[in-house]
């Protein structure tokens, strides 16, 4: 029987090659508490920092992803860790990989590699997966760079979080102002990604790892990564989907219709997303944002190694479906069934 402890992010990740990944306020303790409460109320044994956690206090339900936090959870009987945190090479959790523990989430070393949006896009491109044209700009290049792309462009952090720090620019002046602002702020480091803007429909696709799942009471074995139904995004702000920490996704996202889900374009982008999941050898769900060009062809423009897993488990969180949960509902999963199927994919080192 699993004794599950949920980890949250307690501190900023280290700067890597001059690039800083920003930290979400609370370090995903909100989704961690959602997960813990949903599992606990459905009979799964959850280890918490205190004996009687308060439903309104996120930190009562989750452990910090520090050496002390992990040891505290183990001392209370945890044998499985849900890695609901930002991972990277030499993360504290790696020191516990030889302790015969189980883990739910990605391998830190892989997240460290594929959190780099430019590197990941190049991996996908080299494997014939369609991604937008892009180029890197450093703070040293601010007045000297040569633009190899045509406007409009999207300016985005290399190791960003959701749509935070992402802006659309339509001309040279807007680009200069955006670069100057992002570099002077220093929140994302001294390198950013410029990407060709695609003006078609935006969708997001959750890719599940290979494994055995229970869907509508039937056990199904997937030999390769597979896709949950695509979700379309709308109500963009300045052509960019707003960060879901500011606007609940149920207000700007909807699973595609049955006819849309059967379309050639969607089936084609599914195959690209599944291939991406295979290339990355994922151990847990990832979410891939895709956008169509003027001809309806979809390109993969953002791969998220740690999709949000919020859910309406607590009374005050009833509008907190994640994009992945919207997809999961389409195949008949509740929030608990999504989480239970993620537990089924737990791994040991």
What is each stretch, according to the model?
Residues 46, 80, 103-104, 131, ...:
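Hydrophobic beta-strand scaffold residues
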Residues 86-90, 109, 233-236:
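Short glycine-enriched loops at secondary-structure junctions
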Residues 260-349:
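ATP-dependent carboxylate activation and anion-phosphoryl transfer catalytic cores
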Residues 1-103:
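ATP-binding N-terminal substructure of ATP-dependent carboxylate-amine bond-forming enzymes
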Residues 2, 100, 110-201, 209-214, ...:
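Active-site nucleotide/adenylate-binding loops and adjacent lid/helix of ATP-dependent enzymes
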Residues 35, 39, 120-125, 328:
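Structural element of the ATP-grasp superfamily
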Residues 170-264, 268, 292-299:
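Phosphate-binding site of ATP-dependent enzymes
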